[in-house]
């Protein structure tokens, strides 16, 4: 997954601009929807795969998790995460690891994956990623995923601050670009994976109780932002998936 390493090292250099654009959908839809599924993390061990610069990782630790480990294949993103940890120490360990080839990190109570699975270039790669997440959970542990919605609408993308350029009638694994509306635009290449495929991959990896739902606006969205949040929620750009290791 070298291409993902290269492009996210490039994104790391313009991260502040990207963060400013995507913060609306993250704060008003993605994080609230994701947080609701995490449950009580007090005293829990959490592995956050594909942690990027650690935005969600730090929030997870602040929810009371006893141990949090963040991994990402991009050295640039991990450098940003470690810088944030140095500025405000929370006891989070960050490691450069590719989920598709990551060695066993331990048995965690919860594994989280935020916008990771759409970087799988083949179904086999995604299957390996799913097996790795499964292997790093203790029996009864939970997987909580935030992933791209393959059926997102142009209206929701525009409101969220980016645009996807999928091929017409995309097939599983087809590559396409996402252009974040920074100046100049920041382009990221990802792959098309229908939700049904992701669910099937998780079942094949050994997960049970696999369930998914579209992200939705938080009840605490400011009145002035509700119209934009409603547009973001029309076939939104993201969805959540939960699963359990028996």
Question: What positions do the PLM features span?
Answer:
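Conserved class I S-adenosyl-L-methionine
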Residues: 1-41, 55, 59
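Mobile, glycine- and charge-enriched loop segments
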Residues: 35-47, 139, 143
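Class I SAM-dependent methyltransferase SAM/SAH-binding core
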Residues: 47-49, 53-101
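A short acidic, Gly/Pro-enriched loop at the edge of an enzyme's catalytic core
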Residues: 103-111
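A short SAM/SAH-binding and catalytic strip from SAM-dependent methyltransferases
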Residues: 110-124
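SAM-dependent methyltransferase
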Residues: 144-201
């Amino acid at each position: 997954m070298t291409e993902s390493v290269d492009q996210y090292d490039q994104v790391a250099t313009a991260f502040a601009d990207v963060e400013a654009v995507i913060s609306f959908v993250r704060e008003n839809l993605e994080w609230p929807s994701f947080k609701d599924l995490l449950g009580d993390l007090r005293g829990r061990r959490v592995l956050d795969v594909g942690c990027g610069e650690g935005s969600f990782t730090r929030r997870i630790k602040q929810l009371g998790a006893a141990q949090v480990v963040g991994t990402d294949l991009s050295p640039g993103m991990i450098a940003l995460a470690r810088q944030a940890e140095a500025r405000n120490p929370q006891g989070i360990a960050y490691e450069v690891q590719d989920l598709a080839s990551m060695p066993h990190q331990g048995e965690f109570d919860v594994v989280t994956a935020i916008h990771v699975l759409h970087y799988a270039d083949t179904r086999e790669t995604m299957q390996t990623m799913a097996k790795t997440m499964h292997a790093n959970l203790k029996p009864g542990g939970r997987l909580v995923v935030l992933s791209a919605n393959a059926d997102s609408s142009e209206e929701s993308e525009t409101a969220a601050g980016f645009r996807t350029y999928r091929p017409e009638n995309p097939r599983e694994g087809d590559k396409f670009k996402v252009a974040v509306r920074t100046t100049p635009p920041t382009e990221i290449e990802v792959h098309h994976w229908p939700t049904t495929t992701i669910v099937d991959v998780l079942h094949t990896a050994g997960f049970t109780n696999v369930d998914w739902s579209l992200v939705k606006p938080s009840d605490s969205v400011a009145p002035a932002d509700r119209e934009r949040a409603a547009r973001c929620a029309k076939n939104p750009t993201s969805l959540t998936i939960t699963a359990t290791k028996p």
